Regions:
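Glycine/serine-rich phosphate-binding loop and adjoining beta1-alpha1 elements at the start
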Residues: 7-120
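Adenosine-phosphate binding glycine-rich loop
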Residues: 112-113, 216-325
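Conserved active-site and cofactor/substrate-binding residues in soluble primary-metabolism enzymes
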Residues: 27-38, 59-63, 67, 96, ...
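General beta-strand structural signal in soluble alpha/beta enzymes
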Residues: 51-55, 78-84, 150-153, 201-202, ...
Length: 325
């Protein structure tokens, strides 16, 4: 998927996914460190600054990236900050990387709202997931004047039709994004997706919007902050209902885009300010949104299909120039 998605933004990356089957919430910090270093030793021959470049995702953070960079540098016998992204600033990380996924989603929401003549201020928003992306996203939108009427984590969901106090929730959440277990009155994830709202953002895990609940969604805009949260059948249903669905390959690309920026900065040995990073990110995402939305309107197809058409076309063009086809 990433191989086809990244050409949408003209990023010279391929793509791949990997992970470890574990629950870091049940592990000590020392166990997480040993596991992180062991993972790097296992994949070290396949990764590197000029091979595959790992980046953070679910249940990872800058500390884990730092351990991994340190382990790879020990194996490589050379300080290799460009081996991995999402690092702390002091180890060659990029300004803005920690909130880049959320900022990318905000940019996608702004562009989608503009197409639907919707104001962010006062809009009712539901966010599934309150981890790194979900919590930063909630804070961004809250500060823009949106009403966050529902959020969820792994243990349940919270709802307030008048808008939740996001600053209070952020102050109470733990390092894994858990907050609902502190409240007696919660709702289920099923009920979360049925809430009356203008914008729905699945920012947790895959396959959350299916043909079983797609008809219950009341939002007019759905923006995918998670990877693959909507099934193909649900995508068809939402599109037929006139709901604007902004696909994950576009909406959740803020993180990987700034990971690319981090890699570029590591290679150059020259680092940008957070304002520069955010400006470059906005430029990339707004251009990609315009291209995808225009194609979807011209061909009367959903934005996911339009995004894949663009990504696959650019990938195929590169392959032809290299003599692969």
């Amino acid at each position: 998927v990433q191989t086809c998605a990244l050409p949408i933004f003209n990023l010279p990356y391929g793509g791949g996914k990997g992970g470890i089957v574990c629950d870091p919430r049940q592990m000590s910090i020392h166990e997480v460190e040993r596991l992180s270093r062991g993972y790097v030793r296992a994949i070290s021959q396949f990764v590197g600054p000029n091979k595959d470049i790992p980046a953070p995702d679910v249940f990872t953070n800058s500390q884990i990236m730092a351990w991994m960079m340190d382990e790879y540098s020990a194996l490589d016998k050379f300080n290799s900050p460009g081996f991995i992204t999402g690092k702390p600033i002091v180890l060659g990380g990029s300004h803005g990387r920690d909130r880049s996924t959320a900022l990318g989603v905000v940019i996608a929401i702004e562009q989608a709202a503009k197409r639907r003549n919707m104001q962010i201020e006062g809009a009712k928003v539901v966010i599934q997931g309150f981890g790194n992306a979900g919590s930063f996203l909630a804070k961004f939108l809250y500060d823009l004047g949106a009403k966050i009427v529902g959020i969820s984590d792994a243990y349940g969901a919270l709802h307030d039709p008048n808008g939740l106090d996001i600053d209070y929730l952020l102050d109470r959440r733990d390092s894994f994004g858990t907050v609902t277990n502190l409240f007696e009155e919660t709702i289920s994830n099923k009920e979360l997706f049925e809430l009356d709202c203008d914008i729905l953002v699945p920012a947790a895990i895959s396959n959350q919007i299916t043909e079983d609940n797609a008809h219950d969604i009341k939002a007019s805009i759905v923006v995918e902050a998670a990877n693959g949260p909507t099934t193909p059948e649900a995508t068809r249903i939402l599109t037929e209902r006139g709901i604007l669905l902004v696909p994950d390959v576009l909406a959740s690309a803020g993180g990987v885009t700034v990971s690319y920026f981090e890699w570029v900065q590591n290679n150059q040995g020259y680092y940008w300010s957070e304002e520069e990073v955010n400006e470059k990110l906005r430029e990339k995402l707004e251009a990609a949104f315009d291209t995808i939305y225009e194609l979807s309107q011209n061909r009367k197809i959903d934005m996911r299909l339009a995004a894949y058409i663009i990504g696959i076309k650019r990938t195929a063009e590169a392959a032809r120039y290299r003599g692969w086809a």
